[in-house]
Amino acid sequence: GSEMCIRDRDYPYALHQKGGWLNPDSSDWFVDYAKVVVDALSDRVTYWMTINEPQVFIGCGYAIGKFAPFQKLPARDLAQMSHNVLLAHGKTVKMIRECAKKAPKIGFAFSTPCTTPTDNSPLAIEIARQKSFAFTRERFAFETAWWADPIFLGDYPQDAYSVLKSDMPNIKEGDMELISQPVDFYGVNIYYSQAEENPVSYTHLRAHETVL
């Protein structure tokens, strides 16, 4: 049978002009679009990917300005856009389970940063692990835990609250329950890894519980 990724990178320009992922209604726009796809194709599709690589279209498109729409937005806007993307995912999972014509398998895919140990020593391995999952203000839109924790653990990582502070998104009652709708699989795209050349600089990082 067919397998469907509902959303990868492109975004309708008419909706971009209305604020895009910053618009509070953006998650509902997405569900409306996804419903059209489900109504048309769910009789022949089992595996559904709601959203692919939000780190790419949010991080590269709105944080560092390398992809369309080539913007560099402040942390507060990036956090709210991320939250709306996650809401779109959760609402779409719920809609697919309610409306699909055949039993669906639903997931979400990330583009995951990865650091490789410089050698096989326990210290180098731990340094690489902590670098891979470190949460920083400058790179939070690319961090795995920022996207995965709300879906699998029902909340943003604790580091996010201490790092972003007042720039955390507006989280309404019921949002996290929607975002953390059960999924059937978890997609991971790892395109490359990098070795940590200065491990001493990361020895101060505390352990972080991750979903991986």
Which sequence ranges carry the predicted segments?
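Single conserved hydrophobic/aromatic residue that forms the stacking wall/gate
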Residues: 1-6, 204-212
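Active-site region of glycoside hydrolase catalytic domains
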Residues: 7-206
